C-alpha cells in the first residue's frame, strides 16, 4: 500500500494478533501464481472492455524474481500483463526517524534494483517513489533513480494529499499516448484538504505532470467521465494519462462495497486487519467472492474506473502474496 506497505514488509509481516477479521490459515494456494493470475485476468478483462487500458502495479517487485516459489513463467506473464510498475522507498523510506526522512539501507536498495532489473530490461516503465523532506534529498533521489532508468518522483508529503510546490521533473508539453513516454508523474490519493470537488479538480488541471494517479472517488461519488476527461490535458499543453487507484490486496472500510456486518461476521475472503493502516484488511485475493468486487459487473471497482474514462488502473498491495507466504512459513516453523 502506498504510504506504509514497505514498512510492513521490512518488519517481516508478523502475525497481527487480536485484530478483527478471519485468522490466516494455510490453504492449498500458490500465492505468487494466484496474484499473477489475478493481474492477468484483470488485464484480459480490461482489454476487452476498453482496448488500450493500462495497469500499473505497486509493491510487486519481488514477483519479477524467481524466488519464494515464483517461477520464470510467472515473471514472463507479469511482464506482459503490466504496462508499468511502481516501487516505493527505493532510496528514501516512508518512515521517519526523529522527525526526519531517512535513507533506505543499502541492502534493501540493492534488493529493489535486482528485483526491478527484469522490468527495466524488458522495457517496462518503472516508477520510483521516494519520501523526502529536504531539497538535497530530492535532488539525490532524482539523480539515483534516473541513473537506473526509473521514472522518479520525490514526494515531500507522505500522506499524498497535496500538490508539490516544485515543477515536474523534466516538464514537457508533449502528448502522452503510452506509459513508455512518461517522464514524470504525481500521486494524489487524499483530496480532503481541498475545499470542494471543483477546487480539487481545478488544482489537478493546473499541473503539467505526464501522469496523474488519483482516487476514483471524491467524497462518496466517483469522478465522472467529463471530469476525468478534463484532467487529461496538461496546463501548458499536451495530452497526459490519468490512472485511478484500486487495491487488489486489501479491502477498505471506507469504500462503497464495504458492509457493516463484516466487522463482526467477516466473509470468507477477509483476513487480518492491517494495524498500520486504519480501516484496511488483508484479503484472500484468490477467492472469487473478492474478485467479483474487483471486476466483472457494473458495480465492480475496475468497471467503475473504466466507466469514468480513466486511461488505466493503479493496482496497489500487489505484495499481499508475500503476507500470506510469510504467515504460512511461520506456521510451518
Locations of regions flagged by a protein language model:
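Glycan-processing catalytic domains of CAZymes
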Residues: 22-333
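Bacterial N-terminal signal peptides that target proteins for export
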Residues: 2-9
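Bacterial N-terminal signal peptides
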Residues: 11-19
Amino acid at each position: 500500500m502506498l504510504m506504509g506497505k514497505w514498512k510492513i514488509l521490512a518488519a517481516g509481516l508478523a502475525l497481527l494478533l487480536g485484530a478483527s477479521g478471519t485468522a490466516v490459515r494455510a490453504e492449498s494456494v500458490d500465492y505468487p501464481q494466484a496474484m499473477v493470475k489475478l493481474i492477468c485476468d484483470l488485464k484480459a478483462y480490461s482489454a476487452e472492455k476498453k482496448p488500450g487500458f493500462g495497469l500499473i502495479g505497486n509493491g510487486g517487485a519481488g514477483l519479477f524474481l524467481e524466488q519464494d516459489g515464483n517461477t520464470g513463467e510467472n515473471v514472463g506473464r507479469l511482464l506482459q500483463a503490466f504496462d508499468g510498475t511502481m516501487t516505493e522507498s527505493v532510496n528514501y523510506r516512508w518512515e521517519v526517524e526523529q522527525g526526519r526522512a531517512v535513507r533506505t539501507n543499502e541492502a534493501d536498495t540493492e534488493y529493489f534494483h535486482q528485483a526491478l532489473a527484469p522490468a527495466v530490461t524488458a522495457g517496462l516503465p518503472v516508477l520510483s517513489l521516494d519520501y523526502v523532506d529536504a531539497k538535497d534529498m530530492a535532488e539525490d533521489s532524482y539523480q539515483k533513480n534516473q541513473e537506473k532508468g526509473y521514472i522518479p518522483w520525490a514526494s515531500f508529503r507522505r500522506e499524498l494529499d497535496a500538490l508539490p510546490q516544485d515543477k515536474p521533473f523534466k516538464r514537457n508539453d508533449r502528448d502522452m499516448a503510452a506509459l513508455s513516454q512518461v517522464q514524470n508523474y504525481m500521486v494524489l490519493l487524499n483530496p480532503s484538504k481541498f475545499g470542494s470537488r471543483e477546487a480539487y479538480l481545478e488544482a489537478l488541471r493546473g499541473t503539467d505532470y505526464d501522469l496523474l494517479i488519483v482516487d476514483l472517488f471524491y467524497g462518496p461519488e466517483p469522478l465522472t467521465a467529463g471530469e476525468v476527461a478534463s484532467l487529461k490535458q496538461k496546463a501548458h499543453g499536451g495530452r497526459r494519462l490519468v490512472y485511478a487507484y484500486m487495491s487488489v490486496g486489501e479491502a477498505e472500510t471506507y469504500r462503497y462495497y464495504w458492509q457493516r456486518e463484516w466487522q463482526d461476521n467477516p466473509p470468507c475472503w477477509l483476513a487480518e486487519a492491517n494495524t498500520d493502516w486504519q480501516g484496511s484488511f488483508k484479503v484472500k485475493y484468490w477467492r472469487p467472492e473478492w474478485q467479483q468486487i474487483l471486476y466483472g459487473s457494473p458495480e465492480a471497482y475496475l468497471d467503475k474506473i473504466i466507466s469514468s474514462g480513466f486511461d488505466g488502473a493503479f493496482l496497489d498491495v500487489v505484495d499481499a502474496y508475500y503476507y500470506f507466504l510469510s504467515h504460512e512459513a511461520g506456521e510451518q516453523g
